[in-house]
Amino acid sequence: MPKLIPVADALSQPFWDAVNQRRLLLQHCAACDRLQYPPQQACQVCNSANGLAWKEVDGRGHIATCIVIEDGRLNRRMPDQPYNLAMVTLDADPRVNFYSNLPGTPPYQAPVGAAVEVTFEEVAPNQLIHEWRVAG
């Protein structure tokens, strides 16, 4: 399945640098002790900008919900239909969610509630992306 190649900006560059090192790095707000993704200029909860720092997290979570895309409108993805689109909740902070196609999991077979772990996939020379796979 073709993947989009990320284009980092000043705000997201630390995240993508960590991904290229096979690490998961998220913003952490010291003011309210919350992780957040995607990166933003200020905390999504308390609006603090001064308290944001990058923190490495364990790449474990679980599938909160999943749908199967059968009739998507993105031309780039049409040949891959049907495919999974899962919402993964991070174990380190259940307020943080990621979306994943769950590589290796056939459509209609995503086990909601199952443990997942982050994995990294090369989409261009020297450019990785993060994905989530069912653990085990």
Predicted regions and their residues:
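A broadly conserved sequence feature marking short terminus-proximal activation segments
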Residues: M1-L24, R133-A135
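Short functional micro-motifs and their immediate structural scaffolds
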Residues: Y37, G51-A53
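Short cysteine/histidine-rich zinc-coordinating motifs and their immediately flanking basic loops
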Residues: Q41-C46, W54-H62
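Glycine-rich active-site loops that engage anionic ligands at enzyme catalytic sites
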Residues: I63-G104
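A structural feature recognizing the 12-helix transmembrane core of secondary solute carriers
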Residues: C32-Q36
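Short, cysteine/histidine-rich loop/knuckle motifs that typically chelate Zn2+
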Residues: H28-A31, A42-S48
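Well-ordered alpha/beta subsegment
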Residues: D93, F98-G136
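Residues immediately within or flanking Cys/His clusters that coordinate Zn2+
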Residues: R23-L26, Q40
